[in-house]
């Protein structure tokens, strides 16, 4: 039996096989087969060929080539002076929705500030409610400023829309001013939540995961907590009516 192979490396080895002296010739080659040749008589010649690659394989498994990826047009850095350099995957619809939400937050803050001024009057003198609505106004203004900062982070343009002038009188002959004001606050918080959910839907529609995360983490949780808290205040004011219980409720707000 004989099988040839190329690039043969041969060496000899003497051993005793079956009592006869034999000379084995081992050969290592670069082919992909194993062969042996056996001569008649007491002499045996063996040729062994081990598999090896003809050429080194090219490097594989590269999954990211940055300089090739950077050739994509949408990754080019703008050179126009009035164009944001940081803007990426931020739609015009999302930009407009953020500007609208800024306006919502400022409007609600303005109403709360008017409520603060009303309850701080000397002839109303419900200092706890005044404190509550002043803090609520500041909180809504902080929300607006947070949205402004986010708009700039994403490369959008902040556009401030007009703010509606709120009422200055909150008397209600049946409910009383405290309950009426708190019910108004509850409605405003629910309206704000509805507007925030709209911004979140805009983010989903435009596959803007970063905007969705921002609204979820910074606003939505806090919003439902505010709704729950004010809903409890409404319930308590309904229980106490318009009498002395309002003063006790006000004192609790003042010292919270």
From Swiss-Prot:
Catalyzed reaction equations: 4 Fe(2+) + O2 + 4 H(+) = 4 Fe(3+) + 2 H2O
Organism, scientific name: Vigna unguiculata
Complex formation: Oligomer of 24 subunits. There are two types of subunits: L (light) chain and H (heavy) chain. The major chain can be light or heavy, depending on the species and tissue type. The functional molecule forms a roughly spherical shell with a diameter of 12 nm and contains a central cavity into which the insoluble mineral iron core is deposited.
Keywords for this protein: Chloroplast, Iron, Iron storage, Metal-binding, Oxidoreductase, Plastid, Transit peptide
InterPro entries: Ferritin (IPR001519), Ferritin-like (IPR012347), Ferritin-like_diiron (IPR009040), Ferritin-like_SF (IPR009078), Ferritin_CS (IPR014034), Ferritin_DPS_dom (IPR008331)
Protein name: Ferritin-3, chloroplastic
Localisation: Plastid, Chloroplast
Function: Stores iron in a soluble, non-toxic, readily available form. Important for iron homeostasis. Has ferroxidase activity. Iron is taken up in the ferrous form and deposited as ferric hydroxides after oxidation.
A GO biological-process term: intracellular iron ion homeostasis
Annotated family: Belongs to the ferritin family.
